[in-house]
Structures are given as structure tokens and as C-alpha cells.
């Protein structure tokens, strides 16, 4: 089965990082350990952490964009984090965030209509995330 995957694709996947910095955002799968620097984060924390991250603030200079923990809707705890896993696998919806325009895009499982949800007002009380 692996032999069917082109070598260039395998090289791409093998060189992926565990997180992606897109200032002022940090994109991770699950979250971060709230008491550690970015360099101290373990792979297990970036891929599996839940409650310790979700129920805490953190000192990093980023808003963390994360998934892994399904919610019924996008989760905002600004300026610290935005949860984008809205439970598609459980029959809910798929959500993504366009960071520059600050618009959520959502599509409900089994439907073919994409909702655009402006979320500019979420940033109004977060000085770290003011619009340019």
C-alpha cells in the first residue's frame, strides 16, 4: 500500500512539523501545555492534550487554533484560543477560519450549503488581536 504513494508525497508528510506559526496564531492539533514554552511542548501534548489546555490561559504570544476536542460550535477564549473542531465525524459540521478576514466557514454534514459567519466582534475586547 505504501508503495502506491509517490516518494515526493512521502517526503512531504515525513517533514511536516507538529505545529505551524502564522502570527498572531499558532496552529496545533490538540493544544499546548499552558505552563511550557513552545520549544518545551512534547509531541504528545500537541496531539493529545485536552482539559489542561482548554481550561487554562497561557503565556505564549499567540492565539492557539486547535481541533481534537469536538464542540457543538466553534469555541472562543480570546485572546488565548479558538477551537475549530465542531464534530463533523459525529454528524455535526465542519468548520474552518479565514484568519485575515475573520470569517468562519461551516458546512453541516450531509448538506451542501456553506455558511459564512463574520466574527470580527469577538476581537473587540482582545487588545492582543486588534484588526490591522
Model-inferred region functions:
Residues 1-94, 99-115, 119-121:
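Acidic, His/Gly-enriched loop-helix segments that form or flank divalent-metal centers
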Residues 124-132:
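A short C-terminal boundary segment appended to hydrolase-like catalytic domains
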Amino acid at each position: 500500500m505504501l508503495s502506491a504513494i509517490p516518494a515526493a508525497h512521502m517526503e512531504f508528510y515525513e517533514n511536516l512539523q507538529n505545529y505551524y506559526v502564522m502570527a498572531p496564531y499558532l496552529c496545533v492539533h490538540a493544544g499546548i501545555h499552558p505552563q511550557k514554552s513552545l520549544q518545551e511542548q512534547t509531541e504528545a501534548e500537541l496531539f493529545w492534550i485536552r482539559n489542561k489546555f482548554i481550561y487554562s490561559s497561557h503565556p505564549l504570544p499567540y492565539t492557539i487554533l486547535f481541533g481534537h476536542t469536538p464542540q457543538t460550535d466553534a469555541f472562543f477564549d480570546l485572546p488565548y484560543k479558538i477551537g475549530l473542531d465542531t464534530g463533523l465525524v459525529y454528524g455535526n459540521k465542519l468548520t474552518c477560519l479565514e484568519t485575515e478576514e475573520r470569517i468562519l466557514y461551516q458546512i453541516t454534514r450531509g448538506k451542501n450549503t456553506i455558511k459564512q459567519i463574520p466574527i470580527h466582534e469577538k476581537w473587540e475586547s482582545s487588545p492582543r488581536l486588534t484588526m490591522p
